[in-house]
A protein has these predicted regions:
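Short beta-strand-centered segments that line the small-molecule binding cleft or hinge
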Residues: 122
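Positively charged n-region of N-terminal signal peptides that target proteins for export
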Residues: 1-4
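N-terminal secretory/targeting leader peptides
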Residues: 7, 25-119, 127-338
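Hydrophobic helical h-region of N-terminal Sec-dependent signal peptides
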Residues: 6, 10-15
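C-terminal segment of classical bacterial N-terminal signal peptides
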Residues: 14-23
Length: 338
């Protein structure tokens, strides 16, 4: 009897020891997705869409936690957090990759390079991106997709109709050498600043203006603290959906395949959402009556292009003429002849 009792106790103890392991195996994989914009912006909507489809396609084996509005990391902190493995998904603008040490991504900030949807999509689908992706992966960051968030417009506390209107203005930029050169060529004073700090900086006059896509200007309410908006379409905002390379490479196949499918569907969702939301945002901002709208006429547009083309020449020393020529060919951009 005693022998049977000991055996039973041992069996119960062994089962108890095995319970945490079994329970652990049932726990979903947590993926933290951090971003700096509103949940109502195209990127915010896409993050929530990804959460929905990723959890669905993995049958609950993955749980996606979305952190909007810089609630987990500010934009100048998040890439380092990704490299350290503290967060698994980000969608920063590709302007952030220059300071990371992949300067070639700054090329996409060249003025008037990708001003329309077709040209932008053509560029991001070109074979050139494979080489740039490898350079990013060497930093421990794996691009999963590129999201086109549309063309930039300017806001400021004075009307920006001609290049000389920028002279002396403090303009917020991202940390891109090209954007710095653009501001200086216009006679403005570039101010690198985190996205989360921009509203207050505009409100208090720390900076005089900024450029962004209409959906961000609407959802962050920049139009409430600026007097003028110029529909300039001088540049483009492209996001990269990126993950930690080691994290992605070590995912089991039964998770990587459905997550890859979720990425593709989310990319299609994002691009369609951004196009619609930016058009709607312009109308809503205009209807608010809180900011004065300006559309550039042909003469003004030509003056902007002529003023900013020297930035392309200046950046040949940074990127090399051959690389720039490849970018022009891939994007369909034809530099004006001087």
């Amino acid at each position: 009897m005693y022998r049977y009792l000991v055996a039973a106790v041992a069996a119960v103890a062994l089962a108890a020891l095995q319970l945490p392991t079994a329970a652990l195996a049932q726990q979903p994989l947590i993926i933290k997705f951090s971003h700096v914009v509103s949940p109502d912006a195209p990127k915010g909507k896409a993050a929530l869409f990804f959460k929905e489809v990723a959890e669905k396609y993995t049958n609950g084996k993955v749980k996606v936690e979305v952190y909007p509005n810089s609630s987990l990391y500010k934009d100048k902190e998040e890439l380092e957090a990704l490299q350290l493995g503290s967060v698994q998904l980000l969608a920063p603008s590709i302007s952030k990759f220059g300071p990371l040490g992949v300067k070639e991504f700054d090329v996409f900030d060249l003025p008037f390079l990708m001003v329309d949807d077709a040209r932008a999509h053509q560029m991001m689908a070109s074979p050139m991106m494979a080489d740039l992706n490898k350079r990013l992966e060497a930093k421990g960051v794996s691009p999963l997709a590129y999201w086109d968030n549309g063309a930039h417009v300017y806001t400021a506390n004075k009307a920006l109709l001609w290049p000389e209107d920028f002279r002396g203005l403090k303009m917020r930029i991202q940390g891109s050498k090209v954007l710095d050169a653009v501001a200086r060529e216009l006679g403005a004073i570039p101010q690198i600043m985190a996205f989360s700090e921009l509203y207050q900086a505009l409100q208090t006059g720390v900076v005089d203006g900024e450029d962004n896509v209409p959906s961000n200007i609407l959802t962050q309410k920049f139009y409430e603290v600026q007097k003028h908006l110029t529909v300039s379409y001088h540049g483009r905002l492209t996001y990269a959906l990126v993950t930690n390379k080691k994290f992605w490479d070590t995912l089991p196949a039964d998770l990587r395949e459905p997550l890859g499918r979720a990425v593709k569907e989310t990319t299609d969702f994002f691009n369609a959402t951004a196009e619609k939301d930016n058009a709607d945002a312009l109308e809503r901002i205009k209807a608010s009556g809180k900011i004065q709208f300006h559309n550039l006429d042909d003469a003004q547009k030509k003056a902007w292009v002529a003023k900013l083309m020297p930035v392309h020449k200046e950046m040949q020393s940074r990127f090399g003429k051959n690389f720039l020529d490849q970018i022009y060919k891939a994007s369909g951009f034809i530099p004006p002849q001087s």
